[in-house]
């Protein structure tokens, strides 16, 4: 009993005193809403912008300021200062294309000196620049053409630009290679010159090569050609060496030679019209999503008789509109989704099987020597009006023809025989299958 009385006394002492709620002035009742000192539009922020000490108008929290240092953009500087700074402190990643000051060249200026001193050159829109001497480029070069015209007044065979691998190109973002953009290379009918001889990786973007150029681009160290237009040139592009060349979204029109490549080449989304030899591949390559068309066989340059030589002229064969030279070490070029109209495709001796998947051969001829015809696979190919010819020598009859290397050779005449047993038996294989389906059609 004494223990129970002690517990009751302990509970009485630990309990809180009862609350006494009195309704009166300044006391909120259950049914009243507390009045706000400020309205919704006048509500104060939990912090002030002045407390953050922001460097600009962006809302940057203090945590980000501790982890990241905001660097304000600097103005453009001369190329010579960037070059001198790199020589002193070494390559850095703080300079980009927009950091280099642009020099606006005028007609009559010495372009070779301007390129060496400023590297980033802008030409006047629509102006005509007379090139009276060869321009040698030894270092960085980025020319913004603005549709300016470069007209050559040079002897036959002289190059307008010669790019040499002499000086070191500074570490500037998006200026790592030589760039020619939006330039119209004009060649008068009296002088056949070379537009550019490059021994460095070069980019030609949206340029036009008009006139009877002896050779538009002589690529010796790799290049990328995109969005360019070649009209009436003797040879549009020639590539040799161990470096690859890439051609995209370009047009070749009325050229004696389009692309002559002895190295690895890639051609995509381009058009070749009325070229005596659209493509001549001596090595590996890829041709995809391109259009080859011949509209006449009597006008220049389609009436030219051309040839190509192998083994320093020991083996000479007539040149086709699309020509794959013999190379026992290289496989056939990848040939996908192309359209050929009135074109002659010549195939030399190579490894593997040639499969022009998803390609259209309209009124075309595929010519190949003995033993190569059996390696042509026409599955999933539109070949209703395509003929396959097997070539053989006709005897001692020969004609002199112009070679891809600029020389002339006596080319033997060839005898052709039709081959008809390379097609699939359509009485057994249906066309209502996935044979002509491509996964790329899902993206269209």
Curated annotation (Swiss-Prot):
It comes from the Viruses. Residues 1-42 are annotated as: Disordered. Keywords: Early protein, Host cytoplasm, Host nucleus, Host-virus interaction, Modulation of host cell apoptosis by virus, Phosphoprotein. Its main location: host cell. One of its GO terms (cellular component) is host cell cytoplasm. GO terms for molecular function: ubiquitin-like ligase-substrate adaptor activity. InterPro entries: Adeno_E1B_55kDa, Pectin_lyase_fold/virulence. It is found in: Host nucleus; Host cytoplasm. One of its GO terms (biological process) is symbiont-mediated perturbation of host apoptosis. The modification Phosphoserine is found at residues 438-439. Belongs to the adenoviridae E1B 55 kDa protein family. Plays a major role to prevent cellular inhibition of viral genome replication. Assembles an SCF-like E3 ubiquitin ligase complex based on the cellular proteins ELOB, ELOC, CUL5 and RBX1, in cooperation with viral E4orf6. This viral RING-type ligase ubiquitinates cellular substrates and targets them to proteasomal degradation: TP53/p53, LIG4, MRE11-RAD50-NBS1 (MRN) complex, ITGA3, DAXX and BLM. E1B-55K probably acts as the substrate-specific adapter of the SCF-like E3 ubiquitin ligase complex. Contains a PML interaction motif that allows the subnuclear PML localization. Interacts with host PML-4 and PML-5; this interaction promotes efficient subnuclear targeting of E1B-55K to PML nuclear bodies. Interacts with E4-ORF3 protein. Interacts with E4-ORF6 protein. This is E1B 55 kDa protein. It comes from Canine adenovirus serotype 1 (strain CLL) (CAdV-1).
